[in-house]
């Protein structure tokens, strides 16, 4: 599963870059793919990375709405950019990628927070995604 871990990390980096630059994530994804084809130092972008980024792009408004609704005391704008994008990726994978077990989604998101964010971030990410996991059946019914 190391390949999936790497794919998630790269998807997070693409979301983060898009957020930081104020550019659509699909544009950033296309840039990454182009660079990986022209620069041998850049590893190729995996199918799973593409699936995560493209899936997120289709659900971005709903994902941001859910994060805003359940992140008690935080607005998206006030949230650290790293945490915001870990939560975006985790929310997409948790609610719309059925082949990934929920526990794996939460664990991977917490690991990203440990690697890229503050000491308080892993607990914040785990708490919010844990809440969405509890609500997953009703949230999915709303989507149908």
Swiss-Prot record:
It holds the Pfam family NusB. Keywords: RNA-binding, Transcription, Transcription antitermination, Transcription regulation. The keyword Membrane does not apply. One of its GO terms (molecular function) is RNA binding. GO terms for cellular component: cytosol. GO terms for biological process: DNA-templated transcription termination; transcription antitermination. The keyword Phosphoprotein does not apply. It comes from the Bacteria. InterPro entries: NusB-like_sf (IPR035926), NusB_fam (IPR011605), NusB_RsmB_TIM44 (IPR006027). NCBIfam families: nusB. Belongs to the NusB family. Involved in transcription antitermination. Required for transcription of ribosomal RNA (rRNA) genes. Binds specifically to the boxA antiterminator sequence of the ribosomal RNA (rrn) operons. HAMAP family: NusB. This is Transcription antitermination protein NusB. It comes from Streptomyces avermitilis (strain ATCC 31267 / DSM 46492 / JCM 5070 / NBRC 14893 / NCIMB 12804 / NRRL 8165 / MA-4680). The lineage of its organism: Bacteria, Bacillati, Actinomycetota, Actinomycetes, Kitasatosporales.
